[in-house]
């Protein structure tokens, strides 16, 4: 963990208004376009990479790491940035997502539901591997 936190770009990224809980469930759509974003109760000033990484973890669980990577490429193409910054925040958010999935799995089992959490966990594991490779410089 110290190797990861040593790479945190503390104080180097501009602070912007962030949502704090940005994921597909908080995005409203109308006729194929984003019409709004709801649930701003966790909003704060933070690095833009946190919201992107948080959303990528959710997208990864739902749709897989390739779609999460496409989201990052589209976003980075607009705002610029480095792989290191996003990789560190990806790791932070993925750990939170794994915890949430574990709690969700237990609750689902108690209610008799058997969703495909194993696939979601496999997606998150691949997301972690990709972030670690970016930090090691083996993937741009």
Tell where the protein language model's regions lie, with residue ranges.
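An alpha-helical support segment within catalytic cores of ATP-dependent transferases
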Residues: 1-20, 123-140
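Short, well-structured alpha-helical segments
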Residues: 1-5, 72, 86
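Active-site acidic catalytic loop and adjacent metal/ATP-binding pocket
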Residues: 4-50
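Conserved acidic
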Residues: 14, 67, 85
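Short beta-strand segments
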Residues: 17-19, 38, 90, 96-99
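Active-site activation/catalytic loop segments of kinase-like enzymes and analogous catalytic loops
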Residues: 49-80, 93-111
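ATP/Mg2+ or Mg2+-diphosphate-binding catalytic cores
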Residues: 66, 77, 99-140
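Active-site-adjacent helix/loop segment of glycosyltransferases
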Residues: 84-91
